[in-house]
UniProtKB/Swiss-Prot annotation:
Transferase as UniProt keyword: yes
Family: Belongs to the DMRL synthase family.
Reactions that this protein is recorded to catalyse: (2S)-2-hydroxy-3-oxobutyl phosphate + 5-amino-6-(D-ribitylamino)uracil = 6,7-dimethyl-8-(1-D-ribityl)lumazine + phosphate + 2 H2O + H(+)
Cysteine pairs bridged by disulfides in the record: none
Native species: Rhizobium meliloti (strain 1021) (Ensifer meliloti)
UniProt xrefs under InterPro entries: LS, LS/RS, LS/RS_sf
Swiss-Prot/TrEMBL keywords: Riboflavin biosynthesis, Transferase
Name the UniProt record assigns to this protein: 6,7-dimethyl-8-ribityllumazine synthase 2
Active-site residues, record numbering mapped to chain: R84 (proton donor)
Pfam family, one: DMRL_synthase
Gene3D superfamilies for this protein: Lumazine/riboflavin synthase
Amino acid sequence: MTILSHPSAKIAIVRARWHADIVDRCVDAFVAQWTKLGGSAADVEIFDVPGALEIPLHAQALARTGRYAAILGTAFVVNGGIYRHDFVSGTVLDGMMRVQLDTDVPVLSAVLTPHNFQESEPLIAFFRDHFVVKGEEAANACAQILDARAKLALVDA
């Protein structure tokens, strides 16, 4: 486990509200792990968007403020029968990647697309638990990328 070298870093989380009962597990786990790493829950700001497709634009607006050291986008994209969920997820991830490349603010992803999801209690319970793991992993990755970027800043100095 990495202990934060930047414990006062501000982090934004952009979360989709579709399947909020699942997605919120990621957010809660991120904040819990962030505090275990030495960060403050008060430095994590949460922003809600309707669905996954809105994450990149919202992340871009947040990145452009210069206020956040990193941004996490989280959503649960499932096949709703209207359009292909893998297309939606790919579009969201491409947008998030473009945001971080254009703004130089790391944008992490916990946008998950199960191959086959059905609204059954066993699967819902599985993904609730899985999003806890993903939230913890995202907090660890966030700490690691902030450390890596701090080392890059020393190279540029």
